[in-house]
A protein has these predicted regions:
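Clamp-loader machinery-focused feature within the broader ASCE/P-loop NTPase space
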Residues: 1-126
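Charged, glycine-rich active-site and insertion segments that engage polyanionic ligands
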Residues: 1-52, 69-72, 140-142, 149-329
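Conserved catalytic/switch belt of AAA+ P-loop NTPases
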Residues: 104, 129-146
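Conserved adenine-binding aromatic site and its adjacent loop/helix in ATP-hydrolyzing domains
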Residues: 101, 133, 160
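Catalytic acidic motif of RecA-like/P-loop NTPases
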Residues: 118-124, 129-132, 136, 152
Length: 329
């Protein structure tokens, strides 16, 4: 996902320009927090912000791309850019200590020293505490750029010491249009209608990961799960792909079930159709029970991240029986 360039991700343009405007006017903060998920291009935006800070001939629209600093960045060889990424599932205290030590050294290119930390929510407690001192007293010409996927997982003492860059995520229509420009959408049907692929955004994570899914067989697998859940919930018996789910596939399949249940409730009192069939009219009590059931499915998705093993077929059959009982099917 990091292979994209800033210009290829139009929803990042406004946030990037806001960062450039502040820095161009010389009012740059010493610490910036970018609450932009990797699946939206968070690392791409973070790199562009680092380029803005380090560029020696900054233009009103961003880094010049031609100065010595920009050329070093292009070659991934800038001595004053210090990047920290998770080591496994965590950012560890030794990584932050080494970073803080590097930031005390004189800038080799005579400008700023920039620390770029991606997935900063993965700081363990010791690493977060080690970073706090640098956030409080960063030193002259030190700029920290922190990219996160989940600000809620950060210590308040970290977020309060950073300037959060405003960012507006793209809506589904913008994402669909972007995917069309990438020539990734399935061919229109016989009526000329384009298939809406954004239904699974919450499963894959965002537009960049959805693009990867469309390039591979992953998206088609998600679509198959949705079709097979619809058939299985109607018949009361597992069918097709749900009979042979592996432990690696079950989380995706249950995430799709969660989305299907929510869609079922949303459309139950409308004249719209679900999977080509008229939606049932459900009373509010049944709707509430189905919403609660969907929540149970989502909780299981989270538990499965750490469970050593699970009987996927039995679990799916249990959910089908629960659905039939709730809907008196």
């Amino acid at each position: 996902m990091s292979d994209y360039q800033l210009a290829q991700l139009p929803w990042l343009a406004d946030a990037h320009q806001r960062f450039v405007d502040v820095h161009y006017r010389g009012k740059n903060s010493h610490a910036h927090l970018l609450n932009v998920d990797n699946a939206l291009g968070g690392v791409v935006l973070a790199n562009a912000c680092a380029e803005t800070v380090l560029c020696q001939q900054l233009t009103p629209v961003g880094a010049c791309g031609q100065c010595k600093s920009c050329l070093l960045l292009s070659a991934n060889n800038h001595p004053d850019l210090h990047v920290v990424k998770p080591d496994g599932n965590q950012i560890k205290v030794d990584q932050i200590r080494l970073l803080c030590q590097s930031l005390t050294q004189t800038a080799q290119q005579g400008g700023a020293r920039v620390a770029l930390i991606t997935d900063v929510e993965r700081l363990n407690i010791a690493a977060a505490n080690a970073l706090l001192k640098t956030l409080e007293e960063p030193g002259n010409d030190v700029v920290l750029i922190l990219q996160t996927n989940h600000t809620s997982q950060l210590l308040p003492t970290i977020t309060s010491r950073c300037h959060t860059l405003a960012f507006n995520a793209p809506d589904k229509q913008q994402i669909q249009q972007w995917l069309a420009q990438q020539h990734l959408l399935p061919a229109p049907n016989e009526q000329g209608k384009t298939h809406d692929v954004t239904w699974c955004l919450s499963v894959v994570g965002g537009p960049l990961s959805l693009a990867e899914s469309l390039r591979s067989k992953h998206y088609q697998q998600l679509l198959t799960y949705r079709q097979d859940w619809a058939q299985s919930l109607q018949s009361g018996h597992l069918t097709n792909s749900l009979l042979t789910l592996t432990e690696q596939q079950i989380v995706d399949a249950l995430n799709v079930l969660y989305l299907y249940l929510r869609q079922y409730v949303l459309k139950s009192n409308s004249k719209m159709q679900l999977q080509g069939k008229p939606a049932l009219q459900l009373n509010p009590l049944v709707q509430g029970k189905l919403i609660e059931f969907a929540g149970t499915v989502m909780q299981m998705c989270q538990k499965l991240q750490t469970m050593p093993s699970v009987n996927t077929q039995a679990l799916c059959q249990q959910y089908i029986l629960t659905f039939k009982q709730l809907t008196n099917g």
